Design a protein with these regions (language model features):
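OB-fold nucleic-acid-binding modules
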Residues: 1-173
């Protein structure tokens, strides 16, 4: 099971327009001043990651409405606001799988799973996955099966997807 560390980060939140993401800039860790309140600090280790459970409808269709300073309203996709955050989704039926095949690419063996849940199509992208014996996991492990996933919201070719980075991020029913 994956484990994570809890840290305190001090910096400035800024939007990275080229990458289309928010980031924290100005993070520092001064080893000569370990008590500096601006340091990056390890708080705890070995924590189970937190995943916000999301429905397919919310992931694909939900809009979040904001009010601007002038009182006008505008809406953003829930998935856009959830970019690069960890979510989980349950009961996805795997209908198709595309496996990356390229000897020149580190993603050789990574898979794109086209899933259906509640009448909606959700895309799950994996890293190259390995089982406990170090063998590469193939599409046979997931095709025509129902799965639960834990991953990170991403965007590929204008479509939101759930990126799964390790085998324990997928549970087969």
């Amino acid at each position: 099971m994956r484990r994570t560390n809890e840290v305190r980060i001090v910096g400035t939140a800024q939007y990275y327009e080229t990458g289309g993401t928010w980031q924290v800039a100005g993070v520092s860790c001064n080893a000569f001043k370990p008590d500096d309140p601006n340091n990056l600090v390890l708080i705890s280790e070995g924590n189970k990651p937190g995943y916000q459970e999301v429905t397919a409808t919310d992931f694909l269709e939900k809009k979040v409405t904001f009010e601007k300073e002038d009182g006008t309203l505008y809406a953003k996709d829930f998935a856009d606001l959830a970019m690069d955050t960890s979510i989980s989704m349950k009961n996805l039926y795997v209908k198709r799988i595309y496996t990356t095949e390229s000897d020149k690419d580190t993603s050789n063996g990574a898979m794109t799973l086209t899933c259906e849940v509640d009448g909606k199509t959700v895309t799950v992208r994996t890293n190259v996955l390995f089982d406990e014996d170090g063998k590469k996991v193939t599409q046979d492990a997931f095709l025509n099966k129902t799965i639960d996933v834990e991953g990170v919201v991403g965007l590929f070719n204008g479509d939101y997807q759930i990126k799964v980075v390790a085998l324990d991020g997928i549970t087969v029913h």
